[in-house]
Amino acid sequence: MTNPKHVVQRYLDALVAGDLETIRDSFAADAVWTMYGELPIAGPWRGREAIVDDFLVAAGGTLYEPGSVEFEFPTLIGEGDTVVLEWRVRARTAAGGDYANAYCGLFRVRDGRIAEVREYLDTQYAARTLFGAAAPA
């Protein structure tokens, strides 16, 4: 049995390196990534191709200046098939502003691949900073 923490760490290493092939291989064909909230990129994103091509690559490529994204992964905890990850993103936005947000995700691993991700972040900050949306009154 593959250690779920190792599966998620492999994905994170590929993410930092920009290794699209390994990123794609990290997900089960029927994986689901849910980003909660009302952002234009909120999901669920269903299936490996939708997660990688339509969400991770497309959104990242349009929201941030190329080459400006920096990741930090201070916490990675696993038990059974579940891994909890805390991560931070710093970047220059496509509009030229600074972005720094903290995230938490619950990853479920099945048969050596990521089968589910539930992602949480400060969506009001992301809406203002990435999409120019005013916070609700």
PLM regions and their residue ranges:
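Short, low-complexity N-terminal intrinsically disordered segments enriched in polar/charged residues
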Residues: 1-29, 132-137
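Alpha-helical interaction segments
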Residues: 1-2, 17, 23-26, 44-45, ...
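A beta-strand edge to alpha-helix "cap/lid" segment located at domain peripheries
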Residues: 3, 56-137
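Short, mixed-charge, low-aromatic patches
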Residues: 6-16, 42-45, 61-64, 86
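Hydrophobic pocket/interface hotspot
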Residues: 8-11, 23-24, 31, 47, ...
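Short glycine-rich loop/turn motifs that provide flexible caps or phosphate-binding loops at active sites
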Residues: 17, 36, 42, 46, ...
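A solvent-exposed, acidic/Ser-Thr-rich amphipathic alpha-helical stretch
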Residues: 22, 28-78
